[in-house]
């Protein structure tokens, strides 16, 4: 099921995000908290996978959205999910290219938690009232 696959990718993204965060914490200890331009100077592979996989998550979510529209199903869940994903990507871009502006890291984590919650809620709703979004 496509929605379960999307949820699984989100869980993988969480794990990769934790790795990236641990790397950033280490870089802060090494370079100092006043040198955010150095924190991702030489990122680990997990950063690149995390960044690239986010595009796969967007494409998969848009695909699910198109199937939801085609089937005439409730769109509010997938619209919220796509909104969270786009906000996550925008914050990721800000953190990387603008050297971690104030508040972007906690906001990135908060929206990730909202995304996880929305996807999990949608999965539970589907279990209660199943519908088919198979390929």
Regions from the language model: what does each represent?
Residues 1-135:
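Polytopic transmembrane helical bundles with strong interfacial aromatic enrichment
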């Amino acid at each position: 099921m496509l929605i379960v696959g999307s949820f699984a990718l989100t869980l993988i993204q969480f794990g990769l995000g934790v790795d990236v965060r641990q790397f950033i914490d280490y870089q802060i200890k090494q370079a100092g908290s006043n040198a955010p331009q150095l924190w991702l100077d030489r990122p680990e592979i997990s950063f690149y996978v995390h960044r690239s996989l986010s595009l796969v998550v967007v494409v998969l979510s848009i695909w699910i959205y198109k199937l939801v529209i085609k089937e005439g199903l409730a769109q509010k869940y997938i619209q919220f999910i796509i909104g969270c994903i786009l906000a996550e990507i925008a914050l990721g871009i800000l953190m990387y290219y603008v050297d971690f502006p104030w508040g972007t890291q906690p906001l990135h984590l908060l929206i990730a938690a909202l995304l996880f919650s929305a996807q999990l809620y949608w999965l539970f709703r589907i279990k209660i009232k199943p519908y088919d979004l198979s390929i």
